[in-house]
Design a protein with these regions (language model features):
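Beta-sheet-rich sandwich/jelly-roll-like modules and their strand-loop junctions
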Residues: 1-86, 97-118, 124-161
């Protein structure tokens, strides 16, 4: 009984603490328009590295959801979240077999960030050699908060949907 009461109190306090960190929710998708010439869109491969800078709008980065719609049956998509100084805050891996079995899937982060500070997430691939990426950020970033998008250190145009 006491243990149950303690758990309820902890859950309540955690809920109150998180409540202060939610700002206005926005939805932004970034990526490439796959209706244009294929040669103008970089294909995924072992050496592909995609980086997206962004500026946090509130105290919790609720979710970065990165998905690719077409994919191989082996390998993984790796995402690393770093601060402006290059310190790694979190790393996630999504095996391709999960993508194949469940359709386009993504990787999420729920992490505290400092409002207005610059962060970067980097996407790399291991064992994937096919289609094009569609990168999405759900309830966390607005157009003004997005920084440079690069593929293999080359700047890319961002498409906002």
């Amino acid at each position: 009984m006491i243990l149950m009461l303690m758990l309820l109190v902890c859950a309540f306090i955690t809920g109150l603490r998180r409540q202060d960190f939610y700002g206005e929710e926005t939805q932004t998708a970034i990526g490439w328009d796959t209706s244009v010439e294929p040669q103008s869109i970089p294909e995924l491969g072992e050496n592909t590295v995609i980086s997206q800078e962004f500026y946090a709008q509130d105290g919790i980065l609720e979710l970065i959801y990165v998905s690719i719609g077409a994919h191989g049956t082996t390998g993984s998509m790796l995402i690393t979240l770093q601060d402006a100084d290059g310190a790694i805050l979190a790393t996630r891996e999504l095996p391709c077999d999960a993508l194949v079995e469940n359709g386009a899937q993504g990787i999420s982060f729920h992490i505290r960030v400092q409002p207005g500070k610059k962060y970067v997430y980097t996407i790399s691939f291991s064992g994937i050699t096919d289609e094009y990426p569609q990168l999405q950020t759900l309830p966390c970033l607005s157009e003004g908060e997005l920084g440079a998008l690069t593929v293999n250190a080359q700047a890319q145009e961002q498409k906002l949907y």
